Amino acid sequence: MDSERIVFRVHNQVVSLKPEIISDQYEYKYPAITDGKKPGITLGRAPDLSTAYKSILSGMNAAKLDSDDVCSYLAAAMQLFEGVCPEDWISYGIHIATKGETITPDVLIDVTRTNVEGNWAQAGGTDMTRDPTIAEHASLVGLLLCLYRLSKIVGQNTANYKTNVADRMEQIFETAPFVKVVEHHTLMTVHKMCANWSTIPNFRFLAGTYDMFFARVEHLYSALRVGTVVTAYEDCSGLVSFTGFIKQINLSARDALLYFFHKKFEEEIKRMFEPGQETAVPHPYFIHFRALGVSGKSPYSSTAVGHHFNLIHFIGCYMGQVKSLNATVIQTCAPHEMSVLGGYLGEEFFGKGTFERRFFRDEKEMQDYADLEGARVEASLADDGTVDSDDEDFFSGETRSPEAVYSRIMMNNGRLKKSHIRRYVSVSSNHQARPNSFAEFLNKVYSESS
């Protein structure tokens, strides 16, 4: 008997079949490179740099750019940015460069060129008869890469913010060592015609390559990263938020995870810490895995580890962090339960409020204060009639342990205490809540309870 078949009856007919499902082409894919090959890209015929510069600059001024031409130019211009590799550079077993070697950004990738010629029109660019300088090339490359960062800014009411960011980036690329090559507000005008360029694989690939190079190599034109820095740890917000969290609470990753009391964390933590990834290696391909196309659906994104993401930002909200209050709640990942756990852990790592004496004239004064606080706690615990049951857990000698926190949650039947709710309401009510944000969630769920 075939162990993969099932038998059942339909209208007096016995049916035997083997259930099969479609293959999941969108399953999580880890970025580890196993074939020993550098990330690769295929582009059209390499252009003459001078011709390409004039054509692209003409397109910038006319707010009409061809993405294939831009990508071909960006790849060709990499040869202009020579730098010295500070250390031996190896990632996933691939030897990228040796310490002291002179390298350019294209050392990171394999570029395949076809015979397809670009549309190097000269309209509007013929007034420039001389060859452009390296500074002019660098300025144009920088402005083009800024289109990536601008296209990553999404959401409601971002027009003014985008305009301000674009203006500031323009100012960078008209100040030494760069030179002014376009008129003011050109970048924002061009962006409106290229608003979705962050979704173009080749453009994203080249932005990630430039960023990976200038993040490692000290260079006169390192400010080119202003437009590409968003490619670092792209689609990796789950892992990034956890890293920031453990640094803030000053615990190791192992010790921090002992506080994650929910069965939904098991699969997410297993997914996030898959062996073989170069999360702790300096300047690996891992940092830019999304841009370089070595991973499909990221296992490190906020949606991939949504319970974990929700918990960390509820703790951040309890601590009053604006970044957490503005973050978007993953609605399908138990936000109510995560807010409860976030309240207890927020109290554990942050205390009851913002105001607490932390600085002293000398060590003796600090010790005297600690002794006084200890005596006050002991006195409160000794008199059961004077301690508010809602506050009693706060005055325990073993507060900072996973066992103690778990016990408090169980004693309160998995519900928040009034002090937790007051804290949540306090930090969220004074914040201008964005749609679907943690601040909005806390306002809606807990404002009436307070």
Curated annotation (Swiss-Prot):
One GO cellular component, as annotated: host cell cytoplasm
Changes after translation: Phosphorylated by host.
Keyword terms: Capsid protein, Helical capsid protein, Host cytoplasm, Phosphoprotein, Ribonucleoprotein, RNA-binding, Viral nucleoprotein, Virion
Source domain of life: Viruses
Subcellular location: Virion; Host cytoplasm
Modified residues (Phosphoserine): 389
InterPro entries: Rhabdo_ncapsid (IPR000448), Rhabdovirus_ncapsid_C (IPR023331), Rhabdovirus_ncapsid_N (IPR023330), Rhabdovirus_nucleoprotein-like (IPR035961)
Gene Ontology molecular function terms on file: RNA binding
Stored Pfam families: Rhabdo_ncap (PF00945)
Statement: the UniProt record of this protein carries the keyword RNA-binding: yes
Entry similarity comment: Belongs to the lyssavirus nucleocapsid protein family.
Job description of the protein: Encapsidates the genome, protecting it from nucleases. If expressed without protein P it binds non-specifically RNA and therefore can bind it's own mRNA. Interaction with protein P abolishes any non-specific RNA binding, and prevents phosphorylation. The soluble N-P complex encapsidates specifically the genomic RNA, with protein N protecting the genome like a pearl necklace. The encapsidated genomic RNA is termed the nucleocapsid (NC) and serves as template for viral transcription and replication. Protein N binds protein P in the NC through a different interaction, and can be phosphorylated.
Subunit field text: Homomultimerizes to form the nucleocapsid. Binds to viral genomic RNA.
Protein name as catalogued: Nucleoprotein
Organism name: Lagos bat virus
Gene: N
